[in-house]
Amino acid sequence: RTVIALVAGHVGLTEEKIRVISHDIGGGFGGKVPVYPGYVIAIAVSFLVGKPVKWIEDRSENLQADSFARDYHITAEMAGTKDGKIQATRFKVLADHGYTDASANPSKFPTGLFSIASGSYDYDASYMEADAVYTNKPPGGVAYRCSFRVTEAVHAIERITDRFALEIGKDPAALRMQNFIKKEDFPWKSPTGWEYDSGDYHAGLQKAMDAIDYVGLRKEQAEKRKKGELMGIGISTFTEIVGAGPSKDFDILGIKMFDSAEIRVHPTGKAIARFGTKSQGQGHETTYAQIIAEELGIPMENIQIEEGDTDTAPYGLGTYASRSTPTAGAAAAVAARKLRDKARKIAAYLLEVSEN
């Protein structure tokens, strides 16, 4: 839908006159989120010359013109007590956006950087400032596995947590255990205003430490260092926001990042469901059918899933950032429940019985 919105705005067409058909895609990983200039330019040129125009690029050209990863320059600070209690963090970010904005930029800082950089820790204050700059690089969109700048945010908070542990002479795992949000404190609101719905971080880290025999590894590390041998042990814990859906927090081109599902049940008992997402190998056909089958009681094999054609798909913002099941899948569940409730009312009327 972002392709349609951008093409409509630049070429001067109304959106209902534009159709996007997407065939099977071999993976996405964030690099296919932006609407790159070549897409729009090819269509504009087609109008100018009055002939079909095809946009083709080889692998080398794609690497030169596609979105790039990282290139965030982050200065991070952490304040805490001598006994290891984190009190505050401060982040200053200089972000390279390339020569043009990509479609997901409005969501990049608030949802990616600001939601993650405060970490999984219980403290009161966090200050964040981000400046975006234009350079002569390709569009600085949602690059390969960047997930709205989550990677950079995790790196920043975890590095300064390690530095804090080193400064006060405390084990990095023990410092994290001391500062984790407690299980009984959920739901919990972060210093930047994000609500964490649930979690058990202490149990998660403890399970990982037990699996690798963390205490034994530390002893081995100490013995090796006595011999002049180097052995590093790294720990990283983070809470990632996924689902890219709540419209109050996520936005692309002012469209908001919701998704929809349309389900029709035929007299034969078979159903067809249409979505605005597009499978890139995740298996939407199975997942969505399972959700609908669970809600309606229709066998999975009797449910047809359709994606990839904007002429038939309901309005939605597509597949990326681990969002298809939380958004479109949730929409499928809600739509199926409405169908189920309607069917119960009709059946109750025809059979002259209670809906229950």
What are these regions (language model features)?
Residues 1, 23-28, 57-67, 93-98, ...:
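Acidic, glycine-rich active-site loops and adjacent beta-strand->loop/helix elements
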Residues 1-11, 180-270, 290:
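Helix-loop-helix junctions that connect adjacent transmembrane helices in secondary transporters/permeases
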Residues 95, 124-133, 178, 254-258, ...:
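Flexible glycine/proline-rich, aromatic-decorated loop/lid segments
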Residues 13-17, 49-53, 73-74, 81-89, ...:
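Short coil/turn connectors at secondary-structure junctions
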